[in-house]
Amino acid sequence: MHMNSYHIRVAGREDESFLREMLYESLYVPEGEEPFSRDILEEPFMKKYVENWGREGDLGYIAVNATGKPTGSITIRYFDEGNKGFGYVSDDIPELGMALLPESRGQGLGTALMKELFRGMKEQGIQKVSLSVAPENTAAMKLYERFGFQEVGMSGTSITMLADVI
């Protein structure tokens, strides 16, 4: 399926359950390994990425296919010193999260979502954005590097990356 059979829309409060679903999809599982239990979504360190979606500073987009099914998402949310995300850099830099359903990967959708998010962040005057990625997730790493993300540190086994928006 090509990009022209998709459209991208803003993520609203009513999308919280889909964003939770995407949070689960975003957990990187190396080839041949057991996927995480869905219970992980109830853990505070996961929940905080989408809980009460639509609060101040939240910005996100959802890709919807020709049949109206949401197939991917990209979000940013602010965290603070007392409640850090995995890709936390500072209170004034939002953290990006994105995921696509497996059948929607490798079709340019990640690039389209990223372009839309960067456009939205520029409009809001956001200057920098961070994220956390598993180093083995080479497809994601390549996409992030194309958008100017650079490694700034490690958090556990994941790489923290930072990009200039403006």
Predicted regions: what they are:
Residues 1-14, 166:
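Conserved N-terminal entry element of GNAT/NAT acetyltransferase domains
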Residues 27-50:
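Conserved GNAT-fold acetyl-CoA-binding loop/helix
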Residues 47-62:
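A short helix-loop-beta-strand connector motif used in the catalytic cores of GNAT acetyltransferases and
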Residues 62, 69-78:
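Conserved beta-strand in the GNAT
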Residues 64, 95-106:
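A short, internal acetyl-CoA/4′-phosphopantetheine-binding micro-motif in the GNAT/acyltransferase core
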Residues 80-89:
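A short, polar/charged loop-to-alpha-helix boundary motif
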Residues 90-94, 127-141, 145-166:
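C-terminal "cap" of GNAT-fold acetyltransferases
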Residues 106-119, 123, 142-146:
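Conserved acetyl-CoA-binding loop-helix of GNAT-fold acetyltransferases
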